[in-house]
Design a protein with these regions (language model features):
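N-terminal accessory regions of nucleic-acid-interacting proteins
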Residues: 1-35, 80
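A short catalytic or substrate-binding loop motif that flags glycine-/basic-rich loops and adjacent residues
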Residues: 17, 42-45
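Structural beta-strand/beta-sheet cores of well-ordered domains, especially the beta-sheet scaffolds
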Residues: 21-25, 47-51, 92, 223-225
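Generic beta-strand/beta-sheet core signal
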Residues: 25-28, 54-56, 97-98, 223, ...
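Intrinsically disordered, low-complexity Ser/Thr- and acidic-rich flexible linkers and loops
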Residues: 36-42
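Active-site-proximal helix-loop-helix substrate-binding element of RNase H-like nuclease domains
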Residues: 44-199, 209, 217
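Extended, well-ordered alpha-helical scaffold/bundle regions in very large, multi-domain proteins
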Residues: 205-233
Length: 233
């Protein structure tokens, strides 16, 4: 019998984060053809199953995971998406790890992002172009000496016979919340650390170029490239 101790609960409210300069976000998704066809956000295949948010400024530290499409334990989808839309409308910096993926999913839901978008994965590539691994776990261990605790997620997935990552949507939110919140809070901590390294290496100009180009790259991904199938064959 599966008896892993669970202490996680979904947030009981929607805090006003409008005064924060930096907000980290991480999406959990159902994306069945990700490995074979790429992000389902572009093809409208799959869905967002939950959104994690984290802030840490001025002595106030908060993180929360809002589940909307898990097997059980979901919050009201419309209310959550309206809250996320409100946050994305703030004129501050939104931080992601692999922003192209998360921002594409938000765009597919009709949620635009105002303000600057920072991608810790891009920052990593600028700081160390010879780096082999760019996963959040790898980066947080190298720069923060912290790794995510995936015990509850992995044990619950094993007990229910599902893949803990690609089939996360099949798990009740209570088994995913802690893991998802850590994704957002560690992304934020990593950003603060990498920002110091960007400063030390004087990489501001090239980072600004990457950041300014990003919205255009997202739009290009959705528009695609016209292909003449007859000539292609």
């Amino acid at each position: 019998m599966f008896e892993t101790q669970i202490e996680w609960n979904a947030p009981d409210g929607f805090p006003n984060l409008s005064k924060f300069k930096y907000i980290a976000m991480d999406l959990e998704t159902k994306d069945p053809s990700l490995k074979s066809k790429g992000s389902g956000a572009i093809r409208k295949e799959g869905e967002i199953i939950g959104i994690a948010i984290a802030v840490n400024e001025g002595g106030f530290k908060w993180r929360g995971y809002y589940p909307i499409a898990h097997a059980a334990g979901n919050l009201d989808k419309k209310i959550v998406l309206d809250y996320v839309r409100e946050i994305c409308a703030y004129d501050n910096t939104k931080i992601f790890h692999n922003a192209m993926y998360d921002v594409s999913w938000l765009k597919s839901y009709g949620i635009p992002i105002k303000g600057k978008i920072a991608d810790t994965m891009v920052m990593l590539s600028l700081i160390d172009e010879n780096r082999l691994w760019f996963s959040l776990n790898s980066a947080t261990w190298d720069y923060l000496k912290i790794s995510k605790d995936e015990k509850i997620l992995n044990e619950s997935a094993a007990a229910q016979g599902v893949d803990p990552k690609s089939e996360m949507y099949k798990l009740p939110a209570m088994y995913v919340g802690q893991y998802a919140e850590a994704d957002a809070s560690l992304t934020l901590d990593l950003y603060y650390k990498l920002a110091q390294e960007i400063e030390r290496q004087d990489l501001h100009r090239v980072l600004k170029l990457e950041t300014d180009l990003f919205p255009c790259l997202v739009d290009m991904r959705f528009k695609g490239v016209r292909v003449d199938e007859e000539k292609a064959h």
